[in-house]
Amino acid sequence: MSDEESIKTRLKLRPVAIDTYRENVAYLHRECSVYRAEGFQALAKIRVGCNGKQIEAVLNVVDDVCIVAPDELGLSEQAFQRFGEPAGQLVNVAQAEPPLSMDGVRRKIGGERLDYGDYQAITSDIAKGRYSKMEMAAFLVATGQNGLDRDEVLSLTRAMLETGVRLSWNEPLVADKHCIGGIPGNRTSLLIVPIVAAHGMLIPKTSSRAITSPAGTADTMEVLARTDLAPESLDRLVRMERGCLAWGGTTRLAPVDDMLISVERPLGIDSQGQMVASILSKKLAAGATHLLLDIPVGPTAKVRQMRDAMSLRKLFEYVGDRVGLHLEAVITDGAQPVGRGIGPVLEVRDVMQVLENDPEAPVDLREKSLRLAGRILEFDPDVRGGFGYSIARDILESGRALAKMHRIIDAQGRQERRLEPGRLVFEVRAERAGVVVGIDNFFLAQTARLAGAPMSRGAGVDLLNKLGDTVEEGQPLYRVYAEFPANFEFAREFTRTRSGYNIGDAAFLTKTHMEF
């Protein structure tokens, strides 16, 4: 007899209008006979089943019949959609067995090395919704605290890749680009994709939303167009326009990655091994054959020393080579934000200025994007080495990149409402006269997040001065935009005693790294 058949009391299914993001949550009334008979506890995992379907969910116990009655079982919005049964359907409820793969997590917490089978079991259970957020957090902390050797990273990459669909473009060269993050602004992908696509090379760019930054590529692109594209729409769009700027979450590309990101984001976790596996599994799932990786180095970047950048590059190359991906990694300047805007709307302004060849466009964003695009164009066997930059520049200056960007925007679904920077604004001013010799990337990113970015699209930071600029006492260094009073006050309080700028003598100017 199955567990479902052994339970005599069945409950009526009820959707509960609560957004629990990617976690399945179930709701039982405290006076429910099943709750009392089974000895359930709040936050325990339960299994809900009927008609051969099953779903596991974290249990929440309620006392209000307006949420669920004693004869009902409630499921959060996401869980109800995944379960796929109508409201009022009779369902059975049972204790869920803990996932067997948690043994691997416990062994990793103890410092053991895991093999491919362990990671395959863990990622499979996560993909099936058998891990709660607490269990996923335990896995992330274990792999972050105790680290992953390069073969473990390879195993995790392959395991994550197997949990979702893998796109195939049936072309010998499918390009992609990725930055490991940590640098505010830096919205080069929104320039590289139209340049490369205008050249005719396939570049289906799928991106995550922000994890610990004020905006990810998908967050910024959503100011201009839809990014939540179904796989069939994505396929049609890319074949027509040769490129896209889409969110990877709706295409089920390595879905475990998105589930882990939902836990990484609030915890601020972004460990090296997880990062490599996350990036490469997503790129392989998107069908990439050639990848250009941007590793910024700077005193307040994710990677702060050149030796660490070289080590990370070797790890990417090791894993990339063994999964059949042609990968080139370049080390770039991470001493300060790239562009002037930090936050979705402000970053879009910078991007469009570059595409429109506006003389006010940020020079650093334009130059970095052209250099990276040039390296990607040199993947093309018909482009001679060293000529990629000039080809990319010609595509930009001729207006072909702008035209291609507008076609991509229209194909993805142009946003009807024009978004503007937040209406609540304050300026952060220099406390002394001198030269800007250092800028704290993390501080400015945190300021933008406190102001509401990326959830509030118009929130963020607009830089008025960069490294090497001479400023006077009391001169504005940057403006902070917010859409809601609470965010405005959070950001203003955060910047009340610090600016994130180091102002001093030009002799102490932060050294930069650039490798092209």
From Swiss-Prot:
HAMAP family: Thymid_phosp_2
Organism lineage string: Bacteria, Pseudomonadati, Pseudomonadota, Gammaproteobacteria, Methylococcales
Catalytic activity: thymidine + phosphate = 2-deoxy-alpha-D-ribose 1-phosphate + thymine
Annotated SUPFAM superfamilies: Nucleoside phosphorylase/phosphoribosyltransferase catalytic domain, Nucleoside phosphorylase/phosphoribosyltransferase N-terminal domain, Pyrimidine nucleoside phosphorylase C-terminal domain
Keywords of this entry: Glycosyltransferase, Transferase
Protein name (record): Putative thymidine phosphorylase
GO cellular component: a single term: cytosol
Family annotation (InterPro entries): Glycosyl_Trfase_fam3, Glycosyl_Trfase_fam3_N_dom, Glycosyl_Trfase_fam3_N_dom_sf, Nuc_phospho_transferase, PYNP-like_C_sf, PYNP_C, Pyrmidine_PPase_CS, Thym_Pase_Put
